[in-house]
Amino acid sequence: MSDIKFIEGGISIDYRGQISHVNDLNMEEIERFYIIHQHDTSIIRAWHAHQHEKKWFYVVKGSFTGAFVKIDNWENPSSGLKPEIFHLSAQESRILLVPEGYANGFKANEPDSVLLVFSNKILSVAIND
């Protein structure tokens, strides 16, 4: 069974507009965030692997497909590892939590998609992970 999980949120709409939320997100571990603006749907941003960094992914605009591989051996990973594929959309207000130990890659499904990424490591630590 996968260690990757969704944290479900919701979308509330009335005459004033729309609120997208993920009220069950516990932000105690989060040290930083960054935003990816993916204009081109032909570009794949991959493979970023982190032994110790945990990440939370939230689509602000558009949609993305993410592929994640649990690394079995950091010195000599197996070549036959199978990716887990997840689809994320701004139309579904939820966060994908990917624990440490995974390689990841993303592809925007729509032009000008925006992905918000939270991390449990500051940049100076994450760069060396």
Q: Each predicted region: which residue ranges?
A:
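Conserved metal-binding segment of the jelly-roll/cupin
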Residues: 88-111
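Non-catalytic, conserved peripheral segments adjacent to functional cores
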Residues: 1-91, 111-114, 118-129
